[in-house]
Amino acid sequence: MKFVDEVKVHVLSGNGGNGCVSFRREKYVPRGGPDGGDGGEGGSVIFVASEGKNTLLDFRYRHLFKAESGKHGQGRNRHGKGGRDLVLEVPAGTVIKDAETGEPLVDLSHPGDRWVAARGGRGGRGNARFVSSTRQAPRIAEDGREGEDRELVLELKLMADVGLVGLPNAGKSTLISVVSAARPRIADYPFTTLIPCLGVVRHGEAPPFVMADIPGLIEGAHDGAGLGIRFLRHIERTRILAHLVDISQLSPEEPLRPYRLIESELASYSARLGEKKRVIVLNKVDLVPERDRLEALVSRYEQLGHPVFPVSARTKEGLGELLSALVRILSESGVSLPVEDVEEHVGK
């Protein structure tokens, strides 16, 4: 399934039906009164967060969505039928913004959340509504109101318990493929992962949790370098950040540089990311045979004040301790996300 996380759409609600000018025309009733019916209400365009969606692919090639207009009123006090609402399903985690101003309008973060994007036009009143003591035979009726016309941007932010961040080739894809059933593309060159990847992680008897592999960042990402910040929005909804660092490539002179580079990019994107709980994962320890060097690097990273876990995603060394720590932190911070929808797409 192709992953689409941002689209622009044009929504139109239905127009209200016109009211009718009509008079009774019956045998033996030469002066029948007004009997024009009202026009029907126009249908509205409604967005609903659905458990069965995990991408905005349905909106990739179709951009115009219009609800039905209301029917016109008729004689004999027959009111026009209301137009049907147009209900558009989107994944939970979809933010809808005004296309012109960029202002966020609604955040459909939970399945079942609903938002009326364009409300249907009101139906016009028929002439039967205008009878008064001084006007017994009104020859006027109202036209229906026009529906609303809006251009919107739909922006999907994936929801996960743990978000993997780090430079390209830090081993994020390998890690998520080992600890879950996710099968991202893996190769020994930068930017192998071009889209976010979700996986369900099970560890012992603990409740499962959702992990997201976010495409690698590079210096200047917040200014558009590499893959830019397109996928940084997905990190905002994670509860824990797992910052992966390739320990085998650390420079003796500046061992903290890769970590600080990514942290700087995250801070440039959103100050709130700096407040998230995080763990530091020093990956590829199997490529550092010198024990003294390994211990020295771990010690340097421990000084940053976050839990540090030396691991090898390839050999699975240290993964048990890492997963146990993630489970503990998640249990302390609240209920994990439902995993059923993720499992439907990545397997169990």
From Swiss-Prot:
GO molecular function: GTP binding; GTPase activity; magnesium ion binding
Compartments (UniProt record): Cytoplasm
Gene Ontology CC terms: cytoplasm
Cited Gene3D superfamilies: GTP1/OBG domain (2.70.210.12), P-loop containing nucleotide triphosphate hydrolases (3.40.50.300)
E.C. number: 3.6.5.-
Domain OBG-type G: from-to ranges: 160-331
Matches recorded under Pfam families: GTP1_OBG, MMR_HSR1
Any one GO BP annotation for this protein: ribosome biogenesis
Chain positions recorded as Mg(2+) binding sites: S173, T193
Binding site for GTP: 166-173, 191-195, 213-216, 283-286, 312-314
Cofactor(s) required for function per UniProt: Mg(2+)
Main location: cytoplasm
InterPro entries referenced in this protein's UniProt entry, alphabetically: G_OBG, GTP-bd, GTP-bd_Obg/CgtA, GTP1-OBG_CS, GTP1_OBG_dom, GTP1_OBG_dom_sf, OBG_GTPase, P-loop_NTPase
Superkingdom of origin: Bacteria
Domain Obg: 1-159
UniProt xrefs under CDD domains: Obg
Record's keyword terms, sorted: Cytoplasm, GTP-binding, Hydrolase, Magnesium, Metal-binding, Nucleotide-binding
NCBIfam families: Obg_CgtA, PRK12296.1, PRK12297.1, PRK12299.1
Annotated function: An essential GTPase which binds GTP, GDP and possibly (p)ppGpp with moderate affinity, with high nucleotide exchange rates and a fairly low GTP hydrolysis rate. Plays a role in control of the cell cycle, stress response, ribosome biogenesis and in those bacteria that undergo differentiation, in morphogenesis control.
Protein family (similarity comment): Belongs to the TRAFAC class OBG-HflX-like GTPase superfamily. OBG GTPase family.
Subunit and interaction comment: Monomer.
Protein name: GTPase Obg
Gene: obg
